[in-house]
UniProtKB/Swiss-Prot annotation:
One Pfam family per UniProt: Sel1
Span of the signal peptide: 1-43
Membrane topology: Single-pass membrane protein
Domain of life the protein comes from: Eukaryota
GO biological process: ERAD pathway
Gene name of the encoded protein: HRD3
Function: Component of the endoplasmic reticulum (ER) quality control system called ER-associated degradation (ERAD) and involved in ubiquitin-dependent degradation of misfolded endoplasmic reticulum proteins. Functions as an ERAD substrate-recruiting factor that recognizes misfolded proteins for the HRD1 E3 ubiquitin ligase complex.
Entries under SUPFAM superfamilies matching the protein: HCP-like
Cellular component terms (Gene Ontology): endoplasmic reticulum membrane
Full protein name: ERAD-associated E3 ubiquitin-protein ligase component HRD3
Biased composition (Acidic residues): 72-85
Organism: Oryza sativa subsp. japonica (Rice)
Length: 694
């Protein structure tokens, strides 16, 4: 029986499958932080996608019915966005961003097209305002307006109402009603509801449905990544580090108000080339809370080029090719990319290769020269070169079609964090071209790209609200993004609920959240985040079950959550599992396993040396003096500690009592020192009678 319980963590249970799935997601999500730009000069955080031979098909050369046509003018090459969409995808009737930014146009234009449009706009604006003010009555009124708009068939209102229904805000929580409303909105073209539905299917392992939606959303994300006024958030900021506020990350996210930014700007104005280049990157990509501004980016890159900065030459070439902040001019793009390439800026070769594929800014198309330039870029580990060589071999453009070679190039680009390559590999997994059909992996990879869509800009507004002290609005926006499947938003919303539980910011079924509603909502969010690889979330879920916080005490479910965190190399979870084995709480009483977990904890985190040493001492005492008074005393400590802690907080830490205790301690110290002085003097004069003056 004991062995059976001990082996439980490795049994392929549904939770184990979820864990495996979301560990893959965590890996792929890191790639979403990479830039989608072709000749990208910014840093990319790589990750490793490891495939075995079994993942590849044996016959991967030649024609395939699912392969795209060999066309050099295909959309696969539109890295410089030849045609801009008629409308900014952010200004769809469903977007909240224009409602957050007073400078933006109304999502429905200057005048609402219908009464439902007017109700939706007024409702969402009132809801955001009520969340900021902590006004539950106004929030309920706003929700009623949104519901009225949803009844009128407005897809954005249906999507917002689905969010409120799923969270249990101003109405009983109902996942089935939320799903139905998201379905109505998605069928009407609402992309945010499609995100929510895709995530719902993904959690239920309904990969066929998830892949269909995520593929569409990933394509939309790639299309909009460079033409939207609000760039995708490629630096999701986690508000917390463990249980504490992540002050360093927050400090670096204050945009132009950040001290580091102001220092960089000052240095750039003083002629520092490195600072000019850095400032240009911040404006070009919209990093660290800085609003994207192509005009300022062009200004600083031009200044840097005047100082001889070769990296800025390459970026100027890209700016002219894209027409970002300037009139599109492929001749100028070719000039600057050529200058950069001569200065050994190898990613510029990738841009030149693109121009030769399309025949832009050059005499004519030249696929041979394009391939040579892509190869030079790839030889120097430029991910854009890998990607474009992959497209050449996948389609047989200027080379013999070879899917295996294409897959290898795409995988190298994926491991360098290239979003388009992630999209391509996802498509190969989806269609079973070159790689065995694997819808689970396709969903994972499509999801990581889809999360770069324009809807990700909500997290920018959530972060700005938090930094301004508008916790209510931050919670609402993070909760909205959590509904769309963003892990960072899920953990941020859960952390806010835990950290600011005493404040009136959580909207419940009727008025503000009760403590139980708040605990349950935070618990659900932590659980979703833990499914997506957040080890701290899994640890907190274990604590909730172990101590009965917001849920019924359940040692076995606590152990499952700790095992989930332990599988992600969390030292605290290892320590907790050791403690549970030592005391037989939810796990078999097994001192050998307890010691093993304690040892693992200190191996993973050397800072755990002291608590592990104390735990091992307790383990030795329990093993050698089982049933003794000392063991009973050790077992009673967890019950005594909260009482002592409460006494310290309520009595000792009270301002008045603390002053009295401090004065008393000072008095005792003075009396002690005085008595010691008297005794020392008496010892120095042994003939002096007792009581004589010193």
């Amino acid at each position: 029986m004991q062995n059976r319980r001990r082996s439980r963590p490795v049994v392929p249970t549904p939770m184990a499958r979820v864990r495996h799935r979301h560990l893959l997601l965590l890996v792929a999500a890191v790639a979403a932080a990479a830039s989608a730009l072709l000749p990208c000069a910014s840093a990319v955080r790589p990750f490793v996608l490891v495939l075995s031979r079994d993942d590849f098909l044996k016959d991967t050369a030649g024609a395939h019915p699912s392969l795209p046509s060999a066309d050099a003018d295909s959309d696969e090459w539109d890295d410089f966005d030849d045609e801009s969409p008629a409308t900014d995808p952010l200004l769809s009737p469903s977007s909240w961003v224009p409602l957050l930014d007073p400078a933006s146009a109304s999502p429905s234009g200057d005048e609402p097209d219908s009464p439902s449009d007017a109700l939706f706009v007024a409702g969402v604006r009132a809801m955001l305002s009520a969340a900021s003010a902590g006004d539950d009555a106004a929030f309920a009124t706003a929700a009623a307006q949104i519901e009225a708009a949803a009844t009128g068939g407005h897809p954005g209102a249906q999507s917002a109402l689905a969010f409120l229904s799923g969270a249990g805000m101003t109405r009983p929580a109902s996942r089935s009603r939320a799903f139905l409303l998201h379905k109505f909105a998605a069928d009407a073209g609402d992309l945010q509801s499609k995100m929510a539905l895709a995530y719902s299917f993904f959690r239920q392992e309904m990969y066929e449905e998830a892949v269909t939606l995520y593929a569409e959303l990933a394509e939309a994300a790639l299309t909009s990544s460079l033409i939207s006024k609000e760039p995708p958030v490629i630096e999701p900021v986690r508000l917390h580090s463990g249980t504490e506020e992540n002050k360093e990350a927050l400090r670096k996210s204050r945009g132009e108000d950040d001290e580091d930014f102001q220092i960089t700007e000052y240095q750039a104005q003083r002629g520092n080339t490195v600072a000019m280049h850095k400032l240009g990157l911040l404006y070009y990509y919209g990093l660290r809370g800085v609003r994207r501004d192509y005009g300022k980016a062009y200004h600083w890159f031009s200044k840097a080029v005047e100082k001889g900065d070769t990296r800025a030459m390459e970026l100027l070439g890209e700016i002219y090719a894209r027409g970002a902040g300037v009139e599109r001019n492929y001749t100028e793009a070719y000039k600057w990319l050529t200058l950069a390439a001569k200065q050994q800026q190898y990613s510029a070769y990738n841009g030149l290769g693109y121009l030769y594929v399309k025949g832009y800014g050059v005499e004519k198309k030249n696929l041979t020269k394009a391939k040579e330039f892509f190869e030079i870029a790839a030889e120097h580990k430029e991910h854009g070169g890998y990607y474009n060589l992959g497209v050449l071999y996948l389609k047989g453009i200027g080379v013999k079609r070879d899917v295996m070679t294409a897959c290898n190039f795409f995988l190298r680009a994926v491991n360098a964090g290239q979003p388009k390559a992630i999209y391509q590999v996802a498509k190969l997994f989806q269609k079973g071209v070159g790689l065995k059909r694997n819808l689970q992996m396709a969903a994972v990879m499509y999801k990581s790209v889809a999360e770069r869509g324009p809807w990700s800009s909500l997290s920018r507004w959530a972060l700005e609200s938090y930094l301004k002290g508008d916790i209510g609005k931050a919670l609402l926006l993070y909760s909205r993004m959590a509904d769309l499947g963003y892990e960072v938003a899920q953990s941020n919303a859960a952390w806010i609920l835990d950290r600011y539980g005493d404040e009136s910011i959580c909207m419940g079924e009727s008025g503000f959240c009760t403590d139980m509603e708040r605990h349950l909502r935070a618990h659900a969010l932590w659980w979703q985040a833990s499914e997506q690889g957040n080890e701290h979330a899994a640890l907190l879920i274990g604590d909730a079950y172990y101590y009965g916080r917001g849920v019924g005490r359940d040692y076995e479910r606590a152990a499952e959550a700790y095992m989930h965190a332990q599988s992600q190399s969390n030292a605290q979870a290892m320590f907790n599992l050791g403690y549970m084995h030592e005391h037989g709480h939810g796990l078999p009483l097994d001192l050998h396993l307890a010691k093993r977990y304690y040892d693992q904890a200190v191996e993973v985190d050397p800072a755990a040396k002291l608590p592990v040493m104390l735990a091992l001492t307790s383990l030795w005492i329990r093993k050698n003096y089982d049933g003794s008074f000392l063991v009973h005393f050790i077992d009673s400590l967890p019950e005594v500690y909260p009482v002592v802690e409460e006494w310290v907080e309520d009595v000792l830490m009270d301002e008045g009592n603390a002053t009295i205790f401090t004065l008393f301690a000072c008095l005792v110290t003075v009396l002690y020192l005085r008595e010691r002085q008297r005794r020392q003097a008496a010892a120095a004069n042994p003939q002096q009678p007792d009581g004589a003056p010193i």
